[in-house]
Amino acid sequence: MVKLGNNFAEKGTKQPLLEDGFDTIPLMTPLDVNQLQFPPPDKVVVKTKTEYEPDRKKGKARPPQIAEFTVSITEGVTERFKVSVLVLFALAFLTCVVFLVVYKVYKYDRACPDGFVLKNTQCIPEGLESYYAEQDSSAREKFYTVINHYNLAKQSITRSVSPWMSVLSEEKLSEQETEAAEKSA
């Protein structure tokens, strides 16, 4: 263990170990300035580009020539075609993003407030759930029910006569009479 409260001013002198079992090692040692930076070199050599050029001319330290093998799928293709393909890919990506957003909107799990129940993508009060359960059926059945009601209504309702129907029918009769008179004459 280390005994706290050592005096740093006595850095050169070592205190003997005390009998109480504590070491007298200081927790922090003073910083020596000579450790911070190295002495500057006596001579600095800076090589310029002209000193490197002779090595290159002599053939020393040249990397070996490696044949390049590249395959380009865009070689021989016009810039207009490249831009067109890029635009098509961008439009396809944006279309996918739009379809994903639309799908998430329609399939979004909606949470209803307290006292309401989600029924056919609508929040309805719990008290009216039994009423909606009686009407609940598939879309095809609803379609046929509507058509049957329409046919029954069409058959059961007598044809209503508009006040204009009598005027129109009289005009047709008068036209037919004039045509018949013209043919006979």
Swiss-Prot record:
Region annotation (Required for GRIP1 interaction) ranges: 129-164
Q: Pfam families, per this entry?
A: Calcyon
Subcellular location, record wording: Membrane; Golgi apparatus, trans-Golgi network membrane; Endosome membrane; Cell projection, Dendrite
Q: Which InterPro entries match?
A: NSG
Concerning what turns on (or off) its expression, the entry says: Up-regulated by TP53 after DNA damage. Up-regulated by genotoxic stress.
One cellular component term (GO) for this entry is: endosome
GO MF assignments: clathrin light chain binding; ionotropic glutamate receptor binding
The record's principal subcellular location, in a coarse class, is: membrane
User: Which key words tag this protein in UniProt?
Assistant: Cell projection, Cytoplasmic vesicle, Endoplasmic reticulum, Endosome, Golgi apparatus, Lysosome, Membrane, Signal-anchor, Transmembrane, Transmembrane helix
Q: Which residues lie toward the Cytoplasmic compartment? A: 1-82
Record topology, Lumenal segments: 104-185
Respond yes or no to whether keyword Membrane is given for this record: yes
Which residue ranges run through the membrane? 83-103
* A single GO BP: neurotransmitter receptor cycle
> What is its membrane topology?
Single-pass type II membrane protein
Member of which family?
Belongs to the NSG family.
The role this protein plays is: Plays a role in the recycling mechanism in neurons of multiple receptors, including AMPAR, APP and L1CAM and acts at the level of early endosomes to promote sorting of receptors toward a recycling pathway. Regulates sorting and recycling of GRIA2 through interaction with GRIP1 and then contributes to the regulation of synaptic transmission and plasticity by affecting the recycling and targeting of AMPA receptors to the synapse. Is required for faithful sorting of L1CAM to axons by facilitating trafficking from somatodendritic early endosome or the recycling endosome.
Q: How does it assemble?
A: Forms a complex with GRIP1, GRIA2 and STX12 through direct interaction with GRIP1; controls the intracellular fate of AMPAR and the endosomal sorting of the GRIA2 subunit toward recycling and membrane targeting. Interacts with STX12. Interacts with APP; could regulate APP processing. Interacts with FAM171A1.
The name this protein carries in UniProt is Neuronal vesicle trafficking-associated protein 1
Q: Which organism is it from?
A: Homo sapiens
Lineage of source species: Eukaryota, Metazoa, Chordata, Craniata, Vertebrata
